[in-house]
Amino acid sequence: SHFSLAYYKNNKWTIKQFNRFMEVVEALKLNDINIQTLHICNSPAFLNYPNMHLNGARIGSAFLGRVDADINVGLKKIGKLKCSIEEIKIVPKGFNIGYLNSYKTKKETRIAIVQLGYIEGFNIGTRQDMFRFVDKLRNLSHSIKSFFKKQNLKVTINDKKYNIIGKLGMYHMAIDITNSDVKIGDFAYLEVNPLYIDSKIERKYV
């Protein structure tokens, strides 16, 4: 059993699924089969349908703080990549950075090189399903908003945010650290979804 539309509150299909589940439970009871632990809620259902909790739940994405639901319960995203800064350079105005010369410096710029890229799972996501027309509209709306919204990839170094500049590489990235005291050996922290982190990356749980 698994809810397919529990992302939405008061969804008729979700209620129908739950009622079917309970009908099976009652049928088992009539045959003297008593299930000790009953659970049907995934993460969205656990948040949106408290009356369906029964005496167990199977949450998954909620553990990562990345669940889609119509309720804001203050979940915090977990999962960060940590990598030390191995190289620092000062480049002149008009210097091209990244594949396709995707960024040109507007002034003399101090950059930090971090040996970490998308192959480790940074800035990686799933492709949006577009089986339904409404999914296509939602994806189009998201793309239009992203087009007009300035979104810089950022890292955190010494509790401060810094912009990644240039096209993200497979194994590396460049960070604008102009007018900062960032030095070689400092650590850069990048927010990531743990589901996409490469298996070779060492995991530490705190």
Annotated model-derived regions:
Residues 1-92:
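Active-site loop/helix belt of alpha/beta enzymes
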Residues 93-99:
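Short acidic, Gly/Pro-enriched loop/turn segments at secondary-structure junctions
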Residues 95, 104-206:
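C-terminal accessory subdomain/extension
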Residues 44-45, 100-102:
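Short, solvent-exposed loop/turn elements at beta->coil junctions and helix N-caps
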Residues 70-73, 100-101, 142:
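Short, P/G- and charge-enriched loop/turn segments at secondary-structure junctions
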Residues 4, 68, 97, 158-161:
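A near-ubiquitous, low-amplitude feature marking generic local secondary-structure context
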Residues 59, 98, 163:
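Residue-level signal for pocket-adjacent positions within structured domains
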